[in-house]
């Protein structure tokens, strides 16, 4: 795995640390998140209401998620530098892998249309209609 200090910093800053699992603001329930936005434990089991996590464990879970996302990104064979890779990792952590696959971001990045990719990422992050 590459060093992903920027992605970790971005995720930690914007997600914030939550010791106790919180409900999704859109559904009012599932998926629950805790730590720095983790929805799943490293073994794949989901975070549930009432679960708690320490900051240390939350960082371990985040590093595991980043490793998984990075491994999946490798399979797409995108020609991206480390800054774009970290931005994509942060984005994917925020919206999820499935949503990323169905977004236009991959096509824009693959076509080197980076401004369009950023615009699309902003729509997913800040536009409630995508959630």
What is the meaning of each model-derived region?
Residues 1-29, 38-47, 53-71, 78, ...:
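Long, amphipathic alpha-helical surface segments
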Residues 28-31, 85:
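A structure-centric signal for secondary-structure junctions around beta-strands
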Residues 77-84:
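Structural motif
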Residues 87-90:
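Amphipathic alpha-helical interaction segments
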Residues 92-97:
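Short alpha-helix boundary/capping elements
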